[in-house]
Amino acid sequence: MARRRDGKMCGKFTQMSSRQEVHAFSQPLVITKDADEVVVSTPMRTANIMRLSAAGEREMVPMRWGFAGHDDPNPSRPKHMHVRAETIDQRRTFAQAFATSRGILIVHTFNEGEELPNGKTKQWVVTPNDDLPIAIAVIFEEWHNGPETLLTFVMVTTPPNALIARITDRMPAILPREAWPAWLDETDASLAEAKALLQTYEDGGNWMMAPQQSSKPSPSPGAPKQKPQGELF
């Protein structure tokens, strides 16, 4: 198989957990009034991110995907979508957000793209067999332009595990449940300890990967309704 070597994440269609699902899965959690259901999220669009509030409570907050430059008057053209775990505390663009503004994006599935010899990209859907949501590490910051403000986030990436390495050289930084408190800054973890959480996630055979279907068949009458999907990677 041809593999991408640029270290950039690619792919389409991941399924966001609904607000109710995230609330049930992530207790204790406060749902803010602005955290509406998000079923589709693409770069430059919005997703709900879990973070720690000023009161020290977990909350879901809508944020736009992608960091724009601080001097860019238009945040709809972000310069960064992802950040490498290896250099997250070293690059000026990301170091402050890593130190003070860490969050979690919760999804059901995610896609990775395999670059083919003909220049096209083949999409693969990664799905956990146990059907439990996947927690992806993100960092966020507030973009300013005069009185206008906007919360934005980027996803953290790591080297791939054995499954993902078949098609690409990066994958999302997945956080096991026990890592959430330190990543969300609920504990006294140091920055070195927070960075140490960003390891390649070994799925232990729990994930399956299948080609993304190019089209969806029409559901038969009475068939269970499919959960909506959106683009994340």
PLM region spans:
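Short linear sequence motif anchored by a di-proline
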Residues: M1-F233
